């Protein structure tokens, strides 16, 4: 652990430009990434050194609002990076970017702290095991299965269901998961963070003591928030704070950790806000020139080692639904599986609005998932692709002009499309339909039967918003009885 200097290195604020603060020192300059401390309106304010400007001045990024700072105000060099509490005491707590509790439940009595910037694990320490993480969501498990210890990206524009999907994954995986979970809320809505916290309390993921108060003992999740209303410094670093907590559970306790990030785009966005203030020349579409470096520094630390694993699920906002935008495009290279949410599918009322032809996974290989699963997934995609290519003909000439074979393909594809929808546990309060968890074996068996035409006699409506194929048969009987 880095020791603080015996005599404190004190500087003074020379200028404040929004979230960026310049500090002048008479003696030695603090190192890049060092944390400096001052007070603002009676609160502790942390500044992170980003640049040495020369003439005894450093340029820093503020981790909180800078309103109220004045020139000449004293700033102290802590002699080390921003450090956050790590370990079991963080479980069941909500922390901010600098590791302070924001749940009004007193201090985090952690015995250890860790710096938020760290090197990625060495290649020799990384694990290469390939196994599937079952989510219970049909479209994901069948067509783009997730890797245990892998990186998963949920791509989607505004309002197509990224946060609901990430909450369902937390519900299906984290609640039944033996290890620990860490949730990093990066630049998203405070309301969603609040809802998530109460959901965790209700589900028992955050434990309560005899008086009904939340307690770290028995809790399985740590929450780290830097929400939309926070300055860019906090949003640019909060993902690293969350990751540092997850790394402790992986490296020291040897656990399999789930790391949820909502939203990685806000991490990039905060970096671009700060970048211009730091005097860097913007690159494509106004993003920071260090976009790939920033993303790489974060993503390379999220990995599985011989000690334990971190499986990360990251929501990634796609500006204007354009996947070629530099922010989502830079994320693609780091991911093992991508789940693309499509507005056109959500407009059909099919939820989750996952695009079955655009979502990919390196796990969809016969040697990992088995021959039957692989062939079923490819047959489903082939049927949907044929339907997609016939849509123009249908739009211009109508269904009657198609050959009998093509008509059958279209009917099956429409059933598959509806069968890929699924009621979610977290959406139960809005839809009134009970959520469903479908085992991967049932998913493969059901879709194989549909593709092979075993259920051609059932109506399309029976396939919508159900779990397994047994429910389809049940729903078809109900519909027939209602129509009679």
From Swiss-Prot:
It is a peripheral membrane protein. InterPro entries: AAA+_ATPase, ATP-synt_VA_C, ATP_synth_F1_bsu, ATPase_a/bsu_AS, ATPase_alpha/beta_chains, ATPase_F1/V1/A1_a/bsu_N, ATPase_F1/V1/A1_a/bsu_N_sf, ATPase_F1/V1/A1_a/bsu_nucl-bd. PROSITE patterns: ATPASE_ALPHA_BETA. SUPFAM superfamilies: C-terminal domain of alpha and beta subunits of F1 ATP synthase, N-terminal domain of alpha and beta subunits of F1 ATP synthase, P-loop containing nucleoside triphosphate hydrolases. Coiled coil: none annotated. Its EC number is 7.1.2.2. The keyword Membrane applies. The keyword Metal-binding does not apply. One of its GO terms (molecular function) is ATP binding. It catalyses: ATP + H2O + 4 H(+)(in) = ADP + phosphate + 5 H(+)(out). Pfam families: ATP-synt_ab (PF00006), ATP-synt_ab_N (PF02874), ATP-synt_VA_C (PF22919). Keywords: ATP synthesis, ATP-binding, Cell inner membrane, Cell membrane, CF(1), Hydrogen ion transport, Ion transport, Membrane, Nucleotide-binding, Translocase, Transport. Belongs to the ATPase alpha/beta chains family. Produces ATP from ADP in the presence of a proton gradient across the membrane. The catalytic sites are hosted primarily by the beta subunits. F-type ATPases have 2 components, CF(1) - the catalytic core - and CF(0) - the membrane proton channel. CF(1) has five subunits: alpha(3), beta(3), gamma(1), delta(1), epsilon(1). CF(0) has three main subunits: a(1), b(2) and c(9-12). The alpha and beta chains form an alternating ring which encloses part of the gamma chain. CF(1) is attached to CF(0) by a central stalk formed by the gamma and epsilon chains, while a peripheral stalk is formed by the delta and b chains. This is ATP synthase subunit beta. It comes from Rhizorhabdus wittichii (strain DSM 6014 / CCUG 31198 / JCM 15750 / NBRC 105917 / EY 4224 / RW1) (Sphingomonas wittichii). The gene is atpD.
